Amino acid sequence: MAGSRRLAMRLLSGCAWVRGSDSAVLGRLRDEAVVHPGFLSQEEEDTLTRELEPQLRRRRYEYDHWDAAIHGFRETEKSCWSDASQVILQRVRAAAFGPDQSLLSPVHVLDLEPRGYIKPHVDSVKFCGSTIAGLSLLSPSVMKLVHTQEPEQWLELLLEPGSLYILRGSARYDFSHEILRDEESFFGEHRVPRGRRISVICRSLPEGMGPGRPEEPPPAC
């Protein structure tokens, strides 16, 4: 894990964490597609990974998904966390969600194998609300957003291990998002080699839904 983080830092030397097709897109999504690099310490990243590993190991990697959005993945939802992990997740909630936003009670955990990827998709409003926030563990990756009506408008987020990304508003509903497969994993001219990636994702409640669980499977975030 530490090796992946050092590699990402070498790749990113002198680079921003977000790049886009033009200044208008960067300005439009400045507060709606956000990356906080180094949100987790190495110790916190290790804490989350150790807690998740036993539950993830019981599942096989899958190569199709109920909505065909993910390849090479295993996933789970987790409601019970250790005290140390609860402190971390509370920091995520404070950083990403407003005081008037309610969150889905289970946290979505998605484990991509090194060859795994998430295809371009727009999350259904039935499954989560206007904001999602994800912690990236183990491997650097590149998330790409593309406007659904004007595909020449795009944004790329560089997600190193220990980073937090936040998507809200227009970035959620007007842009598709994906995690690039290894052979396409570039951030500008910088190659970002993919390894196994775990994301820990908090989601706001869908509009008009009370506290609890979504009625259908979670989105591929």
Curated annotation (Swiss-Prot):
InterPro entries, alphabetized: AlkB-like (IPR027450), AlkB-like_sf (IPR037151), ALKBH7-like (IPR032870)
GO cellular component: mitochondrial matrix; mitochondrion
Keywords (A to Z) from UniProt: Dioxygenase, Iron, Metal-binding, Mitochondrion, Necrosis, Oxidoreductase, Transit peptide
Function: May function as protein hydroxylase; can catalyze auto-hydroxylation at Leu-110 (in vitro), but this activity may be due to the absence of the true substrate. Required to induce programmed necrosis in response to DNA damage caused by cytotoxic alkylating agents. Acts by triggering the collapse of mitochondrial membrane potential and loss of mitochondrial function that leads to energy depletion and cell death. ALKBH7-mediated necrosis is probably required to prevent the accumulation of cells with DNA damage. Does not display DNA demethylase activity. Involved in fatty acid metabolism.
Tissues expressing this chain: Widely expressed.
GO molecular function, one term: metal ion binding
Pfam families: 2OG-FeII_Oxy_2
Main location: mitochondrion
Binding site for 2-oxoglutarate: 165, 197-199, 203
Protein EC: 1.14.11.-
Taxon lineage: Eukaryota, Metazoa, Chordata, Craniata, Vertebrata
Binding, Fe cation: 121, 123, 177
Cofactor note: Binds 1 Fe(2+) ion per subunit.
Protein name: Alpha-ketoglutarate-dependent dioxygenase alkB homolog 7, mitochondrial
One biological process term in Gene Ontology: regulation of mitochondrial membrane permeability involved in programmed necrotic cell death
Enzyme class: oxidoreductase
Gene: Alkbh7
Stated family: Belongs to the alkB family.
Cofactor or coenzyme needed: Fe(2+)
Transit peptide: 1-23
Disruption-associated phenotype: Increased body weight and body fat, a phenotype amplified under high-fat diet.
S-S bonds: none
Cellular localisation: Mitochondrion matrix
